[in-house]
């Protein structure tokens, strides 16, 4: 199999959606990588320099407004309202929200360690696992979120939940979870999304569309942090992205125009209100 063969094959996929083309290409490349590992072929033709890897058609993120976040939060049943705080205030993914424990929170230093998620294995079997990308990270704990967690725990004490680790039948692992179901189990997205999240959206008048899933809270966190001047590198670390470049590509349109920042910076030096320097006869200032 030659790189030119891959190039020709990719041309036959030109009419498919960019994201789907990328998924198909990635799957084929994975097969070739396995063949290389098994010494069946010398090289992966998909990784040749002449082969242009398909790119996803990234849609521009339109972050929720503060008013929408608060409205959806208030429409969630009281038992599940903390979901909004964890998503919009900490930038957690849904599985990480479901797996957060008070043991992960340092209330003294104001820091949260994101070290597990609840994920589904083989359809509906719940397991604990590392966060996406197998990447444990630390996230700052804002005072408002800390207050919400503290108040929530006085009404809903954390509960110990045991799940297999990473795979069905994996080593049983117990964590004290902040959020649990009425049956005292870990929250399951197959129940939470259709029966808790979407009804809240409906009551607020938010369209039940993919971009309005729980991930919208995470986008709100990122857009708010960037708007307030946080760096892409820091936001990338808080979100658990493996590549800051991905964070930049996803959220760059939400960042303040660099030209405006530059103009303000120069105006602060040479503008009407800037102090004038005194030039001496020898040319010094």
Task: Please describe what each predicted stretch is.
Residues 1-40, 58, 185-193, 206-216:
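N-terminal core-binding DNA-recognition domain of tyrosine site-specific recombinases/integrases
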């Amino acid at each position: 199999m030659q790189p030119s063969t891959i190039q020709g094959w990719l041309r036959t996929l030109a009419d498919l959606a960019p994201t789907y083309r990328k998924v198909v290409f990635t799957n084929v490349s994975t097969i070739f990588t396995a063949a290389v590992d098994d010494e069946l072929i010398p090289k992966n033709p998909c990784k040749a320099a002449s082969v242009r890897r398909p790119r996803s058609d990234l849609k521009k993120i339109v972050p929720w407004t503060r008013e929408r976040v608060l409205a959806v939060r208030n429409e969630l049943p009281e038992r599940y309202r903390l979901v909004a705080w964890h998503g919009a205030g900490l930038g957690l993914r849904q599985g990480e929200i479901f797996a957060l424990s008070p043991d992960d929170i340092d209330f003294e230093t104001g820091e949260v360690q994101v070290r597990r998620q609840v994920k589904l294995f083989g359809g509906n079997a719940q397991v604990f696992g590392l966060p996406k990308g197998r990447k444990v990270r630390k996230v700052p704990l804002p005072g408002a979120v800390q207050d919400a967690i503290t108040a929530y725990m006085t009404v809903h004490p954390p509960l110990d939940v045991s799940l297999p680790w990473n795979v069905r039948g994996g080593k049983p692992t117990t964590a004290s979870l902040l959020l649990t179901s009425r049956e005292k189990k870990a929250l399951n997205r197959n129940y939470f999304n259709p029966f808790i999240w979407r009804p809240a959206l409906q009551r607020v008048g938010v369209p039940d569309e993919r971009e309005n899933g729980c991930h919208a809270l995470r986008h709100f966190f990122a857009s708010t942090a960037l708007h307030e001047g946080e760096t892409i590198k820091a936001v990338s670390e808080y979100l658990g992205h493996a590549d800051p470049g991905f964070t930049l590509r996803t959220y760059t349109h939400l960042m303040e125009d660099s030209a405006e920042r530059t103009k303000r910076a120069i105006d602060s030096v040479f503008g009407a209100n800037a102090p004038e320097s005194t030039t001496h006869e020898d040319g010094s200032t």
